[in-house]
């Protein structure tokens, strides 16, 4: 079964760029985040791209062919241990590869690998969204929303990570950057930020899925709060009933139940017979029924009589 991350990436692979520059921006991010560039000599390069997601591999190959008409090779390897597939795309040294890398903002002529993001490709919002979409497809993770809400992009290179975090933030979300084992993670924890970014990247269907999960979580949490409140009320009612029965025992020893006023005696008999009921429920056992307030006044009267009996007993001693 595909992971939630793989499902989101599959949806993103079906998003078409709104303009030709969008496709270049997306491909630039895909190659920059999950590609490895090899220098073969002056003006000669080769590129290897690895991914565990078939949809990502298909997107890279399609964009490379459609935009630059470069030759690619694909090797699919299966991990017996992890039961996953690994896709290796190779662009061997060939005419046009260096020019393509320069056009994508990955190479700077005469300087080597570009440190930051390709700003020339990111002048329009749709192109910025496409670049972030490519970065997520290449190095992104999103937790199954049935657990915690968490989305992150794993990248290398401090300048690239810092500029990408700012770019993600420009799409209307609060992105945080954390260094992790020599790499960098740009992450979102807010539900609203995650939904906003998914929509911006083009994964509207999964944004709606997450909203539905949150609604279900909200209902479950509300039910849990009500159940916990009811249990707490029952516990408090049980504690109160224990105190009342202890008071009744004192009344029986100090006064005698038969000597109590009829209404108070009825209260004592009912409480002993129904230790689990609240005062309001206890009142409903009378004929005619009595209110919670009436039962409370009977309890207060019992307390007063017991206090008087205790005082009198102490005076006699």
Model-derived features: positions:
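Short acidic, hydrophobic short linear motifs in intrinsically disordered regions
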Residues: 42-48, 146-147, 278-280
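DNA-contacting interfaces and partner/effector-binding or oligomerization modules
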Residues: 57-58, 62-83, 88-211
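Extended mid-to-C-terminal alpha-helical interaction segments
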Residues: 196, 200-302
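Short, Lys/Arg-enriched C-terminal cap helix and immediately downstream tail that follows
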Residues: 304-314
């Amino acid at each position: 079964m595909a992971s939630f991350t793989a499902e989101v990436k599959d949806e993103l692979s079906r998003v078409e760029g709104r303009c030709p520059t969008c496709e270049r921006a997306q491909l630039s991010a895909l190659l920059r985040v999950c590609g490895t560039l090899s220098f073969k000599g002056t003006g000669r390069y080769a590129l290897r791209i690895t991914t565990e997601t078939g949809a990502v591999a298909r997107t890279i190959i399609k964009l490379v062919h459609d935009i630059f008409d470069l030759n690619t090779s694909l090797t699919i390897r299966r991990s017996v241990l992890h039961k996953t597939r690994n896709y290796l795309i190779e662009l061997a040294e060939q005419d046009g590869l260096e020019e393509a890398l320069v056009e994508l903002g990955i190479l700077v002529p005469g300087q080597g690998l570009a440190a930051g993001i390709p700003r020339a490709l990111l002048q329009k919002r749709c192109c910025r969204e496409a670049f972030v979409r490519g970065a997520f497809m290449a190095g992104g993770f999103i937790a199954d929303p049935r657990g915690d809400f968490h989305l992150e992009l794993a990248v290398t290179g401090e300048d690239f990570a810092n500029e990408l975090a700012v770019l993600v933030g420009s799409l209307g979300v609060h992105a945080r950057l954390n260094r992790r084992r020599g790499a960098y993670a740009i992450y979102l924890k807010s539900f609203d930020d995650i939904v906003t970014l998914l929509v911006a990247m083009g994964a509207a269907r999964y944004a709606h899925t997450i909203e539905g999960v949150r609604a279900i979580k909200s209902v479950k949490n509300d039910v849990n709060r009500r159940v916990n409140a009811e249990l707490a009320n029952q516990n408090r009612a049980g504690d109160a009933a224990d105190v009342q029965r202890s008071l009744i025992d004192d009344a029986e020893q100090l006064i005698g139940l038969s000597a109590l006023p009829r209404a108070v005696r009825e209260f004592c008999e009912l409480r002993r017979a129904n230790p689990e009921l609240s005062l309001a429920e206890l009142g409903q056992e009378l004929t005619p029924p009595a209110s919670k307030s009436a039962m409370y006044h009977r309890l207060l009267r019992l307390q007063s009589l017991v206090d008087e009996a205790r005082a009198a007993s102490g005076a006699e001693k």
